[in-house]
Amino acid sequence: MSTDITTRTDVNTQIAETGIFSTVNASTMEGKAAVYKALNDATPLRDVVGETLSVKDIIVQRVEVETDEGDVVEQPRTSLITSDGAAYSATSNGVFSAVKNILGIFGHPSTWESPLKVVVEEKATRRNAMYRYLTLSLV
C-alpha cells in the first residue's frame, strides 16, 4: 500500500523538476485555457471560505513571495479547478498539504468517478492564534 500511494502522483518531484504540477489535460486549447485561467485569473480561496467546491483538476506552481521581513521565499500556489470551470487559488502550505493528501489517497483526478467535493476552511495555527491558514476538508 505505501508504494501505491507514493507512485500515484508525486507532486513534490514534479514541482522540483519543472516548477509546476498540473492534472489538467493541456493537449487541447480548452485545456490550455483552463491552465492559463487558473494561473492568472483565479478567485482567491480566502474569498470562498466555508463554501463547497467540486474539484476536478489541480495545479500547483512554485512562486516567489515576499515575507513581512522583506525576504523572498518560494511557496506553493495551489489552484483548484471546479467542475463548472471556475478556478480558485491560494499560496498556502495548508492547502498544498491537503492537496498532497488528496492526491496520495484518491489518486490522479482523471481516475476519480466524479469531482471531489471539498470545503475551504480557515484555521488558527497551533502556536499562535493570531496567524491563520487555509485548508480543505472533504464533504
Per-segment meaning from a language model:
Residues 1-83, 126-127, 135-139:
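OB-fold ssDNA-binding interfaces and closely related basic DNA-contact patches used
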Residues 25-27, 89-91, 106:
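N-terminal start-of-chain detector that recognizes signal peptides
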Residues 53-55, 99-102, 120, 134-136:
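Generic hydrophobic, helix-prone segments enriched in Leu/Val/Ile
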Residues 88-100:
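GIY-YIG-like beta-to-alpha core
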Residues 98-119:
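Short nucleic-acid-contacting surface segments enriched for D/E, G, S/T with interspersed K/R
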Residues 108-110, 119-139:
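Short, charged beta-turn/beta-strand-edge "cap" motif at the junction between a beta-strand
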